[in-house]
A protein has these predicted regions:
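P-loop NTPase nucleotide-binding core
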Residues: 32-44, 48-145
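Amphipathic alpha-helical "lid/sensor" segments that cap RecA-like P-loop NTPase cores
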Residues: 222-285
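Conserved Walker B catalytic segment
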Residues: 117-185, 193
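Conserved nucleotide-binding/hydrolysis micro-motifs of P-loop NTPases
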Residues: 33, 67-71, 154, 183-187, ...
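A short, basic N-terminal segment
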Residues: 1-36, 41, 89
Length: 286
């Protein structure tokens, strides 16, 4: 029997919790020509939610985390690598003959991972423009592409004025849907709601909230029942009263409760014991 609770990584399938309303809202938006802005605190499950929604659309999609990006050329490279995962490289090489700066492309024979580099002293803005134009052309030919940009508030740290440049490139793309994810509410709101911002009202805005108590309660109780029987109801309530329905911490605590109930001879105060173990474990980090 496997632990039915998962935390700390992107989850899907049986590990995914509710969010049916948000899933449908994302899907409906992506079926049209508009873009989406999704804001919530960290560890609320934004990435898992969007990945599940996008996977259900059967559309080509590229996922980029802007925390990993340090410059404009690197952003262009990451977007291009994402496209390489979707389409045959030889076909893309033909399209790239029209690039102003053609990258050197290599493939790892063991992992099939693609690496690329642009010539030294390249005009970074021109590189990004060419990549964005390629993505739009592919969307016209293969079906509208979805680009997911996680931790989008980091765009302001990549390069001064990149928000204006990126907005200018995106606004002419008719065959791309963008999903912007962000965990810094004030920064994301400033980017998409401030009138003087280049991205003002660029997409439909959704603030992701906690999972409703009743939905989360059923999810936790049903997965604890095989190892706790009638005690699962009380345990689920105790867990949620402690975590206040925070997605990450609920999954983490429920996972620890399940481990104790499944493998140890403990019948009372299981939730309290689980909390104590988690706290003790994190104490070692300091």
């Amino acid at each position: 029997m496997n632990n039915p609770f998962k935390f700390g990584t992107i989850v899907g399938n049986e590990y995914f919790t509710d969010r049916t309303v948000e899933l449908e809202e994302i899907r409906r938006t992506m079926l049209g020509p508009n873009h989406l802005v999704l804001i919530s605190p960290r560890r609320f499950g934004k990435s898992s939610l969007v990945k599940k929604a996008v996977n259900g659309l059967d559309r080509p999609a590229v996922f980029i985390n802007l925390q990993q990006i340090t410059g404009i050329e690197e952003l262009a490279s990451m977007l291009l690598k994402g496209v390489f995962k979707l389409f045959p490289i030889e076909r893309l090489k033909h399209w790239m003959t029209h690039f102003r700066f053609i990258p050197t492309i290599s493939t790892n024979p063991l992992t099939d991972a693609v690496d690329l580099s642009f010539p030294i002293a390249t005009d970074e803005t021109a590189v990004l423009e060419d990549v964005m134009e390629l993505i739009n052309k592919l969307g016209a030919e293969k079906g509208r592409i979805i680009i997911v940009l996680d931790e989008f508030q980091e765009i302001l740290e990549i390069d001064k004025g990149i928000d204006k440049k990126l907005r200018a490139m995106m606004q002419v793309q008719e065959n791309v849907n963008y999903i912007f994810l962000g965990s810094q509410e004030s920064m994301m709101t400033d980017i998409f709601e401030r009138k003087k911002s280049p991205f003002y009202h660029f997409g439909k805005l959704i603030y992701l909230k906690k999972i409703p108590h009743e939905d989360f309660f059923e999810y936790v109780r049903d997965r604890l029942t095989p190892v706790m029987d009638d005690n699962a109801t009380k345990a689920a309530e105790t867990i949620l009263s402690f975590t206040l329905c925070h997605p990450y911490y609920t999954q983490q605590l429920a996972s620890q409760v399940w481990e104790i109930a499944a493998y140890e001879s403990v019948n009372q105060d299981i939730v309290e014991k689980a909390i104590e173990r988690i706290v003790t474990t994190h104490d070692y980090d300091y």
